[in-house]
């Protein structure tokens, strides 16, 4: 029997004919072998309390929370697009499709005659074999090994307050197409207490733009600026251009040069090594279905 059993109601330890300690109340389904729960048309697991005459798939609380998440996704997606950042439309559409799939209707029919209309009417159902988990007080997943989440389409994380991610070692993300981060109100920070911070655009441009001041500081050492073809510094029509081994200093107004000494000697140069970049492509056999 693999020590299998279903314990219902007022749970008491039962060893042979002896009644033992109180274990709790409700139900306890367990086995020392394997277990499976299957529902071919959909499954709802919840801790939302209901009356005994409520419909099994009365998912109003969980469904309303999904609808609220839809609204937040849609609002933030719209603001992000207004600022030329990425859109959340694909995730919003997937979430809406799932929420809609939890609302359908099936009609009951009584066999062998109807007694005072018993067995008739309509009840909520799912449009497809989806799984929905809902709780008014929190959901946790815990394991001493690894947790895996895989989806052929989209993964949505939506929180009404904050989303926190903490890693005891490394946080590593690899993205095939695009990474977009957008903040509406309170700014963005990227700090490293130790080690370098490296930002590379290995096959295109790198653009840094600010509405107001932009500062580049080195607290202890130096700032290096190097380019293979040209460096151009310009403001209000005046500019300094460094290109082809030449330096141009032009201005529509005054050029003021001051120093205790001025040295104008013959030509000199300082070669500066520039990095090279690799090219790669994701093999087709590792792509999820599109």
Please provide the spans of the model-predicted regions.
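Long terminal segments
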Residues: 69, 203, 212, 220-224, ...
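Structural signature for extended repeat/solenoid scaffolds and their inter-repeat hinge/linker regions
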Residues: 1-226, 230-234, 241
